[in-house]
Amino acid sequence: MRRAIFPGSFDPLTNGHLDVIKRSLPLFDEIIIAVLNNPDKKPMFSVEERCAMIREILPTLKNGNCTLIVDSFSGLTAEFAKAKGATAIVRGIRAVSDYEYELRMALMNRKLEPTIETVFLMAAEEYSYVSSDLMKQVFRLGGRVDGLVPELVEAKMHEKLGK
């Protein structure tokens, strides 16, 4: 079985994340959407809320023969991948700055777990500037994020911030 993890904070999940998931589907038999619990950050949504939103959104994808699983973790991505029996870590790249960061992370992950490969997918042009942090910032300042995050996520952002 070709199993991969797609790790991230997903705070919140964006259409850029969904694009990477969709484009990963033909490459793997199973993809674990691995929601990072980082106690050093103050997220908009709890890990449980993020996992619940992702679980609600994933059935809208046409995933063919690929099974999609949502799980959460804390600690080292490479260790989580190994524990789940994954052979690959999927990462989206939006710009050169992402590549520089992701290359360092991929090399460290390879050092920690040499049997796990990192697969980079270039962001679709229409999402090349979209990040969770930018979506939160724009939303908090009263800007529109429709078309950049799933409708469910936008509704939950309105609920969370009372806007």
Regions found by a protein language model. Give the residues of each.
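Nucleotidyltransferase catalytic core that binds NTPs
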Residues: 1-163
